[in-house]
Design a protein with these regions (language model features):
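Sec-dependent signal peptide recognition
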Residues: 2-9
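Low-complexity, intrinsically disordered Gly/Pro/Thr-rich segments
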Residues: 121-139
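C-terminal motif of bacterial Sec signal peptides marking the signal peptidase cleavage site
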Residues: 13-16
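N-terminal pre-ligand scaffold of iron-sulfur
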Residues: 18-103, 118, 135-152
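Cysteine-rich micro-motifs
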Residues: 105-113
Length: 152
């Protein structure tokens, strides 16, 4: 019985020595406030998103509706590259192309490794190279001032 236990422990140790990811992405200082209804942020209005300077490689702020916002670090936990929200190119009725973002199914993606995360909680999608969640910054909507605060 002791030989079986030793063999199982050895097998478990060998299996766990595979590719390991370190989910500790370096995070820079992030503290800012904005008025999300300001026309300075046109892509944020109406369940959209905006990129901001801060953190390690930037912050993506996403409007989830009803004054609810999420903010994520734009550094890929797997390879350290900057993540983006992929755009779609749509042919308009007037025959011109325009860039649109699928707000109802907004996914964050690393263009280098192909990992993808869902916008609601930063969880990696099935099939992604990374199994790490995106770093989440805190957000606070102040109803009295109409300002949104984002920070570490």
């Amino acid at each position: 019985m002791r030989k079986v236990s030793t063999a199982l422990l050895l097998l478990l140790a060998l299996v766990s020595c595979g590719k390991r990811q370190d989910c500790n992405v370096p995070i820079g200082e992030t503290n800012f406030s904005i008025d999300p209804n300001d026309m300075q942020y046109p892509h944020l209005i109406g369940d959209g998103f905006e990129y901001f300077i801060g953190g390690n490689q930037g912050v993506v702020l996403i409007d989830m509706g009803s004054h609810s916002y999420v903010a994520y670090e734009r550094t890929c936990p797997l390879d350290g590259h900057q993540i983006v929200i992929p755009a779609d190119t749509v042919l308009g009725a007037d025959g011109t192309y325009r860039i649109t973002y699928p707000y109802s199914n907004m996914i964050l993606q690393c263009p280098q490794c192909g990992s993808r995360w869902i916008n609601t909680d930063g969880a990696p999608l099935e099939g992604s190279e990374s199994y790490c969640y995106l770093h989440h910054y805190s957000t606070y909507w102040d109803y009295t001032t109409g300002l949104l605060y984002v920070g570490n």
